[in-house]
Structures are given as structure tokens and as C-alpha cells.
UniProtKB/Swiss-Prot annotation:
Name the UniProt record assigns to this protein: Phosphatidylcholine synthase
Effect of residue 23 to A: Loss of enzyme activity
InterPro entries registered for this protein in UniProt: CDP-OH_P_trans, CDP-OH_PTrfase_TM_dom, PcS
Gene Ontology biological-process entries: phospholipid biosynthetic process
Family: Belongs to the CDP-alcohol phosphatidyltransferase class-I family.
Cytoplasmic face of the membrane: 1-15, 63-76, 122-133, 178-187, 233-241
EC number from the UniProt entry: 2.7.8.24
pH dependence per the UniProt record: Optimum pH is 8.0 in cell-free extracts. Activity decreases as pH is raised or lowered.
């Protein structure tokens, strides 16, 4: 009597499932980030987070290339991706904010709680994307927001305003940029995002002992990425061919 029905697994299925494993590896990188943040090694935490985001950036194109959805229809890459995104974009940055005590007590705790709850609700919104691939409402990219606050060594007041304003904007019909998928001003948007990323990595290499010109650059590029979606929403003809 056979309890298991063994079959030869096609190479296409092995290849497709390996992409899911790649995506899931982001959870382990996030765990390493949690360990680092718990020990107040925030520079190390952001390096682990950066690696997780690199995985997040490459797994989608690879999945489409090898047709994961068609080969493994019973495994939801979208669900897996959302789980990893919530951990890396929301939970880990919120924990870092709390551990750092950036906003003081008890407000760092309150802010972290507001971040994780509002973001969980946002992930359930089926209409979070517009027809032009803007995000409707603040798209819970708390990894970028909290990282920027660390880079500029924000004061309690500044950090509080940024965090609680972003929580409120999560639920308002204001457009936010997806730097890759939005076509309007795409070359400029990608260029600004690249500059922000390079400056951020430089700040990490300096262990957040950030010179003024880097702070100015991070703030300027970060503000652009934060508000350009709303500007394009107000001026619907701007950036159209």
C-alpha cells in the first residue's frame, strides 16, 4: 500500500519554486535586521534591509521571465510578496523607530503602533493603485521614511511630524509616486531615486556621521519623491508626451 504518490518533478517547476524561495529569503534578511535593531546596531540593520529590498527588486522580473504563476498556479507569489513587503517595508522600520527612541517616550511606541496598524489596513485596500500606477495614499514605504530620519538625525519634533503626517496621508486620496512604473517624468524620477539611494548608501558607509551636503541631498531628493505624485495629480498634463 502506497501512502505517497511520488512523481518526477519537472525542471520548470523546480525553477519556478526556486523563485519563491528567493522571495522568501527576504524574511530571513529581515530577521537579521530585527536582531541588529534589537542590539541597537542600526547601520547593520539598514544593510540587511537593503539586501532584502534588492531581493524584492529582482524576484518579480525573474518570476515573470520563468512564468512562475503559470507553472505553479497553486502557489501565490503575490501573497508571499505582500508578507515579505510588510515585514521589510513596515514592521522592521517601525521596530527601529521604537528601539531608537527617536521620538521619545512614550511617543516612539505610539508612532510604531500607528505605523504597523495603518499599514496593515493599507495592504487590504484593493484600490491602492491608480490607472497610471500611482499609489493612492501614502504607500507605507516606511523603510525609506525611517531611513531618511536616521540619515538626517531628525529631532523629536521633525520625526513626529513626518511619521504622523504620513500615517494620516495613508488614508487620503493623494497620489504618491512609484518611481519605476509611473511613466510620467520617469527618467527624472528614476534619476532622483538613484541619487537618493547613492547618498543613502554613502551615509551608511559613514555610520550616519553625515556631512551637511549629504543631508541636504537626501532631504531634497526625498521631498521630491514624497510630493511629486501629488504635483502630477494637481497638474494632470505635466510630464505627458
Amino acid at each position: 500500500m502506497k501512502f505517497f504518490n511520488y512523481r518526477r518533478v519537472p525542471y520548470a517547476e523546480i525553477r519556478a519554486f526556486s523563485v519563491h524561495i528567493l522571495t522568501a529569503s527576504g524574511s530571513f534578511l529581515a530577521f537579521l535586521g530585527v536582531v541588529a535593531a534589537a542590539e541597537h546596531r542600526f547601520v547593520d540593520m539598514f544593510w540587511w534591509l537593503g539586501l532584502a529590498l534588492l531581493v524584492d527588486g529582482i524576484d518579480g522580473p525573474i518570476a515573470r521571465k520563468v512564468q512562475v504563476k503559470e507553472v505553479l498556479p497553486n502557489w501565490s507569489g503575490d501573497t508571499l510578496d505582500n508578507v515579505i513587503d510588510y515585514v521589510t517595508y513596515v514592521l522592521l522600520p517601525a521596530f527601529a523607530l521604537y528601539q531608537s527612541g527617536m521620538i521619545g517616550e512614550p511617543w516612539s511606541f505610539v508612532a510604531a503602533g500607528a505605523i504597523v496598524v495603518s499599514s496593515a489596513i493599507y495592504y487590504a485596500d484593493m484600490g491602492m493603485k491608480t490607472d497610471e500606477y500611482f499609489f493612492s495614499g501614502f504607500p507605507v514605504v516606511w523603510n525609506m521614511v525611517v531611513f531618511t530620519l536616521f540619515v538626517i538625525q531628525a529631532s523629536e519634533v521633525t520625526a513626529s511630524i513626518v511619521v504622523f503626517l504620513s500615517v494620516i496621508l495613508t488614508f487620503l486620496p493623494i497620489n504618491f509616486l512609484h518611481p519605476v512604473r509611473v511613466k510620467r517624468l520617469r527618467p527624472l524620477n528614476l534619476g532622483i531615486f538613484l541619487v537618493w539611494s547613492v547618498l543613502g548608501m554613502y551615509a551608511l558607509l559613514l555610520h550616519f556621521e553625515t556631512p551637511p551636503w549629504v543631508v541636504v541631498g537626501v532631504v531634497a531628493t526625498g521631498l521630491y519623491l514624497y510630493v511629486i505624485g501629488f504635483i502630477l495629480q494637481i497638474f494632470p498634463k505635466l510630464g505627458r508626451a
